[in-house]
Amino acid sequence: MPRKGPVPPREIPPDPKYGDVLVQKLINKVMKDGKKSVAEWIVYTALEEAAKEVNMHPVELLHKVIEKLKPEWEVRPRRVGGATYQVPIEVPERRQISLAIKWLVQAARERPRGRGQYTMIERLKAELLDALNERGGAYKKKEETHRMAHANMVFSHFRW
């Protein structure tokens, strides 16, 4: 922990096409080995194709998807008297967004290749549309996190 107080969060510049910070965060999460132009192409194409299917603006679509994937509660391990309890805590706004984007990209990457979903563009598009309709791997991850937190509410008095 730094001695000179809390570290201020870094400012992320908005993406060049839509001027939105959330799109830039998604691009950064999709990026592999520093290939940003490839990540931009994947994200922009997937967003545009998904938005075309549901007649929405791509940025509006992404904001709705992230809103549906943001977890309100999560569990954190807490050691009390030799036993480790899973203590539910409320998730701060910044972490909610980070987790939602992380789960979205992770679910798209883990999606099985097949049934017309071979490229990352197709898998990300499918995951975006599934999350919008409250289905898919990312939404299941959010539900699982909430279920764990709800099941462990008995230990909420151990919150710090």
From Swiss-Prot:
<comment type="similarity">
    <text>Belongs to the universal ribosomal protein uS7 family.</text>
</comment>
<dbReference type="GO" id="GO:0003735">
    <property type="term" value="F:structural constituent of ribosome"/>
</dbReference>
<dbReference type="InterPro" id="IPR000235">
    <property type="entry name" value="Ribosomal_uS7"/>
</dbReference>
<dbReference type="GO" id="GO:0019843">
    <property type="term" value="F:rRNA binding"/>
</dbReference>
<comment type="function">
    <text>One of the primary rRNA binding proteins, it binds directly to 16S rRNA where it nucleates assembly of the head domain of the 30S subunit. Is located at the subunit interface close to the decoding center, probably blocks exit of the E-site tRNA.</text>
</comment>
<dbReference type="GO" id="GO:0000028">
    <property type="term" value="P:ribosomal small subunit assembly"/>
</dbReference>
<dbReference type="InterPro" id="IPR020606">
    <property type="entry name" value="Ribosomal_uS7_CS"/>
</dbReference>
<dbReference type="Pfam" id="PF00177">
    <property type="entry name" value="Ribosomal_S7"/>
</dbReference>
<dbReference type="InterPro" id="IPR023798">
    <property type="entry name" value="Ribosomal_uS7_dom"/>
</dbReference>
<keyword id="KW-0820">tRNA-binding</keyword>
<dbReference type="GO" id="GO:0005840">
    <property type="term" value="C:ribosome"/>
</dbReference>
<dbReference type="GO" id="GO:0003729">
    <property type="term" value="F:mRNA binding"/>
</dbReference>
<comment type="subunit">
    <text>Part of the 30S ribosomal subunit. Contacts proteins S9 and S11.</text>
</comment>
<protein>
    <recommendedName>
        <fullName>Small ribosomal subunit protein uS7B</fullName>
    </recommendedName>
</protein>
<dbReference type="GO" id="GO:0006412">
    <property type="term" value="P:translation"/>
</dbReference>
<dbReference type="InterPro" id="IPR005717">
    <property type="entry name" value="Ribosomal_uS7_bac/org-type"/>
</dbReference>
<keyword id="KW-0687">Ribonucleoprotein</keyword>
<dbReference type="GO" id="GO:0022627">
    <property type="term" value="C:cytosolic small ribosomal subunit"/>
</dbReference>
<keyword id="KW-0694">RNA-binding</keyword>
<dbReference type="GO" id="GO:0000049">
    <property type="term" value="F:tRNA binding"/>
</dbReference>
<keyword id="KW-0699">rRNA-binding</keyword>
<keyword id="KW-0689">Ribosomal protein</keyword>
<dbReference type="InterPro" id="IPR036823">
    <property type="entry name" value="Ribosomal_uS7_dom_sf"/>
</dbReference>
